[in-house]
Amino acid sequence: MTILIQRRGLLATIFSLFTSKGVLQGSNAAKGDGIFPADFVWGASTSSYQIEGAVEEDARGKSIWDAFSHTRGRVKNGDTGDVACDHYHRWHEDVDLLSSGNFTAYRFSTAWSRILPFGTGSIEHRGLDFYDRLVDRLLAKGLRPWLCLYQWDLPQTLQERGGWLCD
């Protein structure tokens, strides 16, 4: 029997388990009670293609993952990141979940096709604005943003010219 769990339900369950056991509660983790040192960083990590969705919004260009996942037979069930977890539209809620779970950091990657839709040339400011708003919200909630500059998400047009190493 296969049971499908929605991301928010899974996260809520994990947070509940951690907080009910005191693992993430300030009385344990923040004071370094011997389980974890006081300076231990509790965080979460995501990959832009796996969570953002909104692949055709705000002038985002096609990425190598768009090309790969839309090629028949490459991904089980033909799944794509077209919608994914819809983080692009639900990032406020996602940051609130991190904050309510007493995390202290969030590591995220950039979708370069959202910033440089064609791999070179003009910067798409709506892409930068998205990440700017995300960082502002993280800081406002007391979460330390950790930016991963590259996690295998490249504009397809740049890949067709040889990737990062092209002239």
Residue ranges and their predicted role:
Residues 2-18:
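N-terminal secretory signal peptides and thylakoid transit peptides that target proteins
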Residues 2-3, 83, 123, 165:
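Pocket-edge positions in alpha/beta enzyme catalytic cores
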Residues 21-45:
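C-terminal segment of N-terminal export signals and the immediately downstream linker at the start
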Residues 27-30, 90-94, 131-133:
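Short alpha-helical segments and helix-capping/turn motifs at coil-helix boundaries
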Residues 46-65:
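Short, solvent-exposed beta-strand-terminating loops
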Residues 62-97:
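Aromatic- and Gly/Pro-rich amphipathic surface segment
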Residues 97-167:
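Substrate-binding cleft and catalytic face of glycoside hydrolase catalytic domains
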